[in-house]
Amino acid sequence: MKSATTLVLLAFVGVLHAQMPPALVNAERAKILEGVKSLPKAGAPGPIGIWGNMAFPILSAPDKDGVEIAVAAAAGYAKGRVILFGHNSYLAGGEGGDHAKLMENCVNWAANKEKPRLGLKGVNAVNLYKQHEFKVETFDKIDKKSLSDFDVVIVNMQGIISAEEGAAVAEYVKGGGGFIGGMTGWAFSQTSGGKDLAVSHGLNQALMPAGIAITDMSAFDQLRSFEARVELPQMMNASEAISAIKKQRDGGPALTAEQMKQGTNAIQIAMAAQPPDRSNLKAAVLAALGTAGADAVVPTAQAPLTADKHAAQRLRLGMETRVLRLAAGEGVAAHPAHEAFPGKVPEGAPRVSGEIKVTPSIPGWTSTGLYAAAGDTITVILPEKLADKGYAVRIGCHSDTLYHLDKWERAPDITRSVGLATATTKTASAFGGLIYIEVPGRAKDDEAFTAVVQNAVPAPLFVLGQDDDAKWSEIKKRPAPWAELACDKLIVSCPTEVARAINNPTQLMEFWKKVVEAQDDITNQTAERKRPERIVADVQISAGYMHSGYPIMIPTSAAPEMTTFGKLKFPGWGFYHEIGHNHQRGNFTFDGTGEVTNNVIGMYCYDAVLKKDWLIGHTAITEEARKEHIEKIKKASNKWQVWKSEPFTALTTYIQLMQEFSWESWRKYLYSFDDPAFGPAPKSDDERRDQFLVRYSKITNKNLGPFFDAWGIPVSSAAKAEVSKLDPWMPKGM
């Protein structure tokens, strides 16, 4: 017999425009969270978009600004029920804590009946669910016949992308079935060969009428666990937020700054899941905001759009950029914000065709020296046999998205990547940008080929070894607003006005080549390198002053330093720091050294490339500063806590090792991880610290145990014993 609460819940299924009352939401959430206090974070989960009238968050956590983001959500859908998790690891129930209990509750809630029959697909957890007295089987095929054997199915959604499978699941749920699914949405592009989650995932799309969906966003970076709470903000549901915003605009209750921030965030997350042909949510947002009028504001560095003062404008612009990113290939109009950034193509700039040599053994972005003007349709042609093999055309190098930031100095998402599914592809960008051919990692065995790009604007592109300084004096006159300079180890992207000030591109790119080669060499990664590093200047980046990755992102204010040989030679610290991040590996980087070992690698550039004192790069490593770090450690009651929380204090430890034992000791340490004589690589932070001590002690033929103790670096007694017969070493002043 169904409970009274269940009957109320079912009664709401047929109501199209009424939200579930908060008391009912809390009652249903309480069932799912019964006996659950917390859930460990599994992997790197992403947020769930929530907008349905019968949808609600199950588990969430606040971001740095206190805005709640859901990692799991539930919804009623016709006669059935759906639960989604932002990572597939949650489906197996094996993360510890109250995880198993949570999944037991999820099955019971989704089944809405006693002793449900449970089917698992892509989830290795038969024994766990049997322990909870469910009748459990695995199944392989998603179709009407297979699904009919179960009351609830738990499905790893990562690879379930066909529309037919999605339709089968949707019909199953509408008929009364329970569906529990999860996937790593932000990784879908990688696992699917470059496809877009909102467009290409048939199952995620099929469940959208329930009003919840997996998104391609990431979140929860610093989180360790999710606390179970029966009461969560109503405004986590985008429909609730849209309704509240509309009521405020119509003279109803005013929203607090916190409510507006929560609501706009919920709408942005929900919009991230929407394919371009699904207009319900978009229409509701536009209705709530009213006509654009004065709201049509273009963000700039001088006049940014802030969360506190420009919530409505940010909602509108954020929605526009999400829709434009997924819009059909042709017929995309230029967005007004493109003129502020990345910039307008000069009037009268010629449109040309270019033949681009593509080397499939070099994955990532292949520069073309061409630019797509905002709103222009470009055509890309590649050999027929390579169509639909994972190659793509990218428009724009400014790949950071800014939706999560409280301040926007440009539109939050301005690049596009479109798969080359056919031999001829037409596409356009509302913002414009440099054009690239994207090469998938799996294409390494393909033969080199030529791609043709038509209706593009010539852009300055200098290639070391192919162009010389005299040729550059002509190349830099090309009209596109963005330019690139390249060598086989690194490519820089900067405003053309900055590039035109360069008169010695050969010297500049030879220098950059040496920087990357030096870091490759000291870290034993020369043979690993498959593609050049990239550094892109942007008016606003997603995190920090600069950040690592592909590409490394820097502010446009740093572009002149990046492209001026004299400035780069000193100080250059930030660039070497970020390239160093890209060279970090887990074997030698443990808790507290994420911002340290990259600096060790970066400092090596001063010695090997600049041929200067390698301690001149930063004021926090001068002799006086290092003395202060040492004194602080001496006085600390908890040396380890100080050491691991202050990067330049920790860096002083490494500096002492280099000063005494030379850079060759660091080289041997990093190379030792490929030397079987040193044993297997570490698998945990405890092992990494132990092996740091043991390997370095053996390399230097000194017992570094007392040195580690002086700095407060915890190592095991076994590790200390292993090096105890060596002569101890301690630097002066310690």
Q: Which residues fall in each region the model found?
A:
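Beta-strand-enriched, solvent-exposed domains that form extended recognition/catalytic surfaces
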Residues: 327-459
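Activation corresponds to long, low-complexity, non-globular regions
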Residues: 219-220, 226-336, 481-500, 509-512, ...
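Short, surface-exposed beta-strand/loop micro-motifs that present aromatic residues
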Residues: 66-78, 481-484, 696
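Beta/coil-rich, acidic/histidine-enriched accessory regions frequently appended to metallopeptidases
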Residues: 283, 293-344, 349-353, 685-734
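N-terminal signal peptide c-region/cleavage motif recognized by signal peptidases
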Residues: 13-15
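Active-site-proximal alpha-helical
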Residues: 239-262, 268, 492, 625-719
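Helical hinge/lid and interdomain linker segments adjacent to catalytic or ligand-binding clefts
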Residues: 19-29, 41-50, 60-71, 79, ...
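Catalytic cores of extracellular degradative/oxidative enzymes
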Residues: 472-473, 481-659
